[in-house]
A protein has these predicted regions:
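Portal/gating segments that form or line small-molecule/metal binding sites
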Residues: 1-138, 148-191
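Extracellular, beta-strand-rich glycan-interacting domains
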Residues: 145
Length: 191
């Protein structure tokens, strides 16, 4: 069975996107070699990417561009090479290479995907998908990057969660740019 993981950024005050729905705050202007190497290593690890429509549109508008290849060549290469799945009821088609569009019930489709042979699956962005799949107990790993920024308001990654999901910290790593990567796995479900 394939594992389903999440790799996402949050602010110190727990927001996934700012008050305008923007995530660019997580990508600081100053390059950080240690952080870039970590991100490139994650991207080169392979797998299949899973997005919701909004994240797909953001990613598809950036990673295939010359600017992405200039700024983060290893990550751009991996993002363009890796197979991708986008869940959307409103998109008519997808144009980014190696992308499959699914319109069915999210939890049902993800259960099917996890039971198919293939690489592990990683959700990037896609807060509503993360929330729904966490509620269903379908996420095996959460890799959360706490960024050294306070947004004051925005939306959390788990908006809409109806019941608690208890996690166990597996690993934590601090980077020179102030990011703290925390790896969690589900511990038990609370009623």
């Amino acid at each position: 069975m394939r594992k389903l993981g999440v790799f996402n950024n949050v602010s110190l005050d727990g927001y996934f996107v700012d008050a305008y729905g923007d995530m660019r705050w997580a990508y600081r202007d100053k390059p950080d070699a240690e952080w870039n190497a970590f991100v490139a290593g994650n991207a080169s690890g392979g797998g299949e990417l899973l997005f919701g429509r909004i994240t797909y549109e953001l990613m598809a508008s950036y990673w295939p561009t010359p600017l992405a290849k200039q700024n983060m060549p290893a990550v751009a290469e991996a993002m363009n090479r890796m197979p991708k799945i986008v869940f959307s009821r409103t998109l008519g088609k997808v144009t980014w290479n190696n992308t499959k569009l699914l319109k069915g019930d999210l939890a049902t489709e993800v259960r099917k995907l996890k039971n198919e042979p293939g690489p592990d699956i990683v959700i990037l962005g896609s807060g509503s998908i993360v929330s729904q799949l966490a509620q269903e107990g379908l996420i095996d790993e959460f890799q959360i990057v706490v960024n050294p920024i306070i947004l004051g308001k925005g939306r959390t990654m788990f908006d809409g969660l109806k019941e608690r999901v208890t996690l166990k910290l597996v690993k934590s790593r601090v980077f020179g740019n102030g990011n703290v990567v925390q790896d969690y796995e589900p511990a038990a479900r609370d009623a």
